[in-house]
Amino acid sequence: MTNYIIRRLLLVPVLLVGVTLIIFGMLQLLGPVERSALYVVDFPKNEKQIDAVIKRYGLDDPFFVQYWRWLVGVQRPDTQGNIVRDGGILYGDFGYSRTASQEVIDIIKNRFPNTLDLALWTIFPMLSVGIWMGVKAAVNQNKFFDQAARIYSIIGTSFPTFVFGLLLLMLLYANNQWFLPGKMSDWVSILIYSGEFKQYTHLLSIDALLNLRLDVFWDALRHMIMPIITLSYISWATFVRVTRSSMLETLRMDYVVTARAKGLKESDVINKHARPNAMLPVVTMMGGSIVGLLGGVVITETVFNYPGIGKAAADAAAQLDVVTILGLAIFTGLILIISNLVVDILYAFIDPRVRLS
């Protein structure tokens, strides 16, 4: 098991290099003249200005020279003559966002807790209810619940996210205002910035519980309900379908038939013999569901005006803010690599064949 974890950990730097090479390579599809526009507020009209920018930032240097400079930055003298490091994503310098008028790393610090708060509340129903429905559908094959679950899984995986989000916005907010877009109400914002509300984790819903403020927790939940439903319904439907298929296959295995022949209760056969083994494909799918979740937040946060990483990426894309998009893409890639590492380790704990291989 230890060797397996070590091998997976050693793979992380390789994956990071691959991600950064792909992202930086996509930027290099633009010529030096086009990329020079990223370093000035207005695109320079004078050819001498363009040449000066290209020369200063080495935009016509060989690919790997530019790539290394992008990773570690360069040392330049500041206005006082002191040598300072300019750039370098390995040092946390992802560049300056002209869309948000702040450093990209500050956007990540301010926005990622909001997306994480939303993701945590999305993953719980997605996994628990999706797996429960899949198991129940398999146990009741061809009965009413199974038919309903199969219909839901087909509809859920074929309904566009943004259309579903707009429908929720119209039904639950525009007509009834049961739930609200955005992150919080004005009175919660005033409470937070007054200093009376301690931000332990910077996750609003969690901090509300830690501060014993159920009114703040309910307000946070009212703002997250629609994004949670929108983000989870596709993966939820996928988990239902995969769990059902895996469970049906497991129920036909010899060891399950033997357990029934021994006279074990049906609940013990399902919960102790069939379901644990049926979870292996489900665990494998978790990595892909996280990818889908992070992809879905761009649309979902934009539809519901939720101030997370996805909304920041959408705003940057609308303004052609390439520096911000690259920084957020690298950070998202890092999150995906870590998430898949956790899933691989979890899979090894569940399946002894993996950790013993």
Features from the language model and the residues they span:
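Transmembrane alpha-helical segments of multi-pass membrane proteins
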Residues: N82, I154-F162, A278
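Hydrophobic aliphatic residues
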Residues: M26, L30, Y39, P44, ...
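Short alpha-helical functional segments enriched in proximate histidine and acidic residues
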Residues: V12, V74, T115, A119, ...
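Alpha-helical transmembrane segments of integral membrane proteins
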Residues: T2-N3, P113, W121, P125-F145, ...
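Hydrophobic alpha-helical transmembrane segments of membrane transport/permease proteins
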Residues: L16-Q75, L172, N176-V216
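Small-residue (Gly/Pro/Ala) motifs that create kinks and tight helix-helix packing interfaces
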Residues: I23, F164-L169, A313, V343
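N-terminal signal-anchor/first transmembrane alpha helix
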Residues: M1-P62, I105, N110, L127-S128, ...
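An internal, D/E-rich "acidic patch" concept
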Residues: L59-I131
